Amino acid sequence: MENKSARAKVQAFGGFLTAMVIPNIGAFIAWGFITALFIPTGWLPNEHFAKIVGPMITYLLPVMIGSTGGHLVGGKRGAVMGGIGTIGVIVGAEIPMFLGSMIMGPLGGLVIKYVDKALEKRIPAGFEMVINNFSLGIAGMLLCLLGFEVIGPAVLIANTFVKECIEALVHAGYLPLLSVINEPAKVLFLNNAIDQGVYYPLGMQQASVNGKSIFFMVASNPGPGLGLLLAFTLFGKGMSKRSAPGAMIIHFLGGIHELYFPYVLMKPLTIIAMIAGGMSGTWMFNLLDGGLVAGPSPGSIFAYLALTPKGSFLATIAGVTVGTLVSFAITSLILKMEKTVETESEDEFAQSANAVKAMKQEGAFSLSRVKRIAFVCDAGMGSSAMGATTFRKRLEKAGLAIEVKHYAIENVPADADIVVTHASLEGRVKRVTDKPLILINNYIGDPKLDTLFNQLTAEHKH
């Protein structure tokens, strides 16, 4: 239980970091394109346009993250506080302050939240606007100074330490060893904590100097996942074999890596294939001096190629290809050694049916009254979006007017009638909603989704 609790806490932390970064990914990609095109080594070198690169990464992007983090904690006033506090850590720093913005944003939201709570019942009538504006201004000033004098220098020291440790791995040729951490963490849905918390800030820092960074590639390579799913397509059995082709296409082209996680959890030995694929891909990226100009989100092959700078396409394609081949070879060997026949047993379908039918018991609501279904995942962007789209289309074809949308765990709507989420996220989802849960292992081919669909169509026909 303690391990599950610790994992849930790390997932929640990663989800919070993601909620700060994901809404601003478009700005990061815009900066990446400007960098790839107009810096001296870019596709269309232009000294005039290249002047935009520095201010964007130094001021705009960190302030956007800080403002978003403040909004998550303290609403609109928190967003303002987060932006003010972030400027404090930016000024005087020699590096882009992404780690600092991820601290100052939520801290600013928290500070103004407590300030507003303390003043709430003490404001005389008619003075609300004056006191609210001045309280935010004074608190913002103090937070900005704190960031400038204390938090900024502390973050700079921590950032330098982490950067030097990872760069030491790079220079020693040990960078591929990061896959030993990355791959197991990813299948436990901790990928957001790693990407947004460590690699993205380091990658942006390196890209601002070199025009590209390998840090954007060490945990996002779509090759190993492609190799694993290809092996299941050819050598898997039962449901895993039938669902793998669709998952493979969406993973590689759509960039939703969560699709291969259930396959690894189902056959834990295949984590060896993922680690080996990740290590070999990273080794190839490093060998050929590969790198991307910004973080690929989602991590599809299209995003990889679009963010590959001039002169690095061979490294990108080679790293993805090698990761695919190694993962495919090892996964195929593991599946061929597997002697048990994997089929969907009647018990499994019975459990799926019972999970849905339980909602129809006395005291529970009727499925005929279901109007909104929420598909939920960590970030609310990738796997849940795909699952919601697929399920919504099935319902539309059946003529059912049921709203199906996707959400991050923290944003599950109060008026959702049913919540669908991955089984590994059950604990976190239960903490934010008491709605009936459908726990699945695959967002597009899970038997429980088929059972839910059949039950809904049967109920709505009556």
Swiss-Prot record:
Keyword hit for Transport: yes
Alphabetical list of CDD domains matching this protein: PTS_IIB_mannitol (cd05567)
UniProt key word Ribosomal protein: no
Residue(s) carrying Phosphocysteine: C377
Predominant subcellular localization, coarse grouping: membrane
Ranges facing Cytoplasmic side: 1-24, 72-134, 187-273, 336-462
Keywords annotated in UniProt: Cell inner membrane, Cell membrane, Kinase, Membrane, Phosphoprotein, Phosphotransferase system, Sugar transport, Transferase, Transmembrane, Transmembrane helix, Transport
InterPro entries reported in the protein's UniProt record: PTS_EIIB-like_sf, PTS_EIIB_2, PTS_EIIB_2/3, PTS_EIIB_mannitol, PTS_EIIC, PTS_EIIC_2, PTS_IIC_mtl, Sugar_PTS
Active-site residues, Swiss-Prot/TrEMBL: C377 (phosphocysteine intermediate)
Function: The phosphoenolpyruvate-dependent sugar phosphotransferase system (sugar PTS), a major carbohydrate active transport system, catalyzes the phosphorylation of incoming sugar substrates concomitantly with their translocation across the cell membrane. The enzyme II CmtAB PTS system is involved in D-mannitol transport.
Protein name from the UniProt record: PTS system mannitol-specific cryptic EIICB component
